[in-house]
Amino acid sequence: MGSRCAKLNTGQSPGHSPGHSTGHGRGHESSMKKLMACVSQDNFSLSSAGEEEEEEEEEGEEEEKEELPVQGKLLLLEPERQEEGHKDNAEAQQSPEPKRTPS
């Protein structure tokens, strides 16, 4: 899913060059909006997939709900790492979180 997002941005680069002199502001806004939409879609797609996968592996609905927002932040910060080690990141984060709660 991240690949599709990257392709969208790549395809915009060549189209942005000729439109640069026509209307920079307009082109920039479009890029931003498309980028945001792309990130949002990516976020939802990965989150949904993560929910299903984690549900099968670990039976903890409460933990999953707490983890969802964390996954969203990770996606924006390091989308590549999320794709490669999606499950690893999720499990690694669940370990320290429960320990912090009693503290």
From Swiss-Prot:
GO process annotations (BP): cell differentiation; chromosome condensation; flagellated sperm motility; spermatogenesis
Compositionally biased region (Acidic residues): 50-66
Biased composition (Basic and acidic residues): 78-90
Keyword Transcription regulation listed: no
Signal peptide range in chain numbering: none
GO molecular function, one term: DNA binding
Region span, Disordered: 1-103
Biased composition (Low complexity): 10-21
UniProt key word Transmembrane: no
Free-text function comment from the UniProt entry: Protamines substitute for histones in the chromatin of sperm during the haploid phase of spermatogenesis. They compact sperm DNA into a highly condensed, stable and inactive complex.
Family: Belongs to the protamine P3 family.
The protein's name: Protamine-3
Source organism: Homo sapiens (Human)
Lineage, uppermost ranks: Eukaryota, Metazoa, Chordata, Craniata, Vertebrata
